[in-house]
């Protein structure tokens, strides 16, 4: 499946849990969701990423550095959702990326 097909499939899928299932099978779904979260402040993408990070944190963890970019964008709602994703990823934080952002968390 190419990137355009994946993007269209996400848009056409009404049920978020179906997008979560798709993300578990198709590697391009997570970067597309992160891009939507960062560039469009897409709440649906944020919610799907929260679900994905709860269910399969190892799939989302490689994108940790991209996800934390949302902390400095948009509003408190986006920051709150981003912290939820990060909290879910901490159980698999084998590269200790938390150390880079923990001061930002405690200052919030």
Question: Language-model features: where?
Answer:
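Hydrophobic/aromatic-rich structural module bridging two neighboring secondary-structure elements via a short loop
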Residues: 59-87
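Short, well-structured alpha-helical interface segments that form or flank functional binding sites
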Residues: 44-47, 62, 77, 100
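Structural detector for internal amphipathic alpha-helices that build alpha-solenoid repeat scaffolds
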Residues: 4-25, 44-57, 80-94
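Short inter-helical turns and helix N-cap capping residues of alpha-solenoid HEAT/ARM repeat scaffolds
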Residues: 38-42, 74-76
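Amphipathic alpha-helical scaffolding segments comprising HEAT/armadillo-like alpha-solenoid repeats
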Residues: 3, 24-36, 57-69, 92-107
């Amino acid at each position: 499946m190419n990137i355009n097909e994946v993007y269209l499939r996400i848009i056409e899928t009404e049920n978020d849990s179906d997008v979560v299932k798709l993300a578990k099978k198709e590697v391009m779904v997570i970067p597309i969701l992160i891009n939507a979260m960062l560039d469009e402040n897409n709440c649906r993408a944020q919610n799907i990423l929260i679900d994905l990070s709860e269910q399969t944190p190892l799939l989302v963890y490689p994108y940790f550095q991209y996800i934390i970019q949302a902390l400095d964008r948009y509003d408190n709602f986006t920051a709150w959702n981003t912290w939820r994703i990060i909290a879910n990823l901490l159980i698999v934080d084998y590269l200790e990326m938390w150390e880079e952002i923990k001061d930002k968390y405690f200052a919030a």
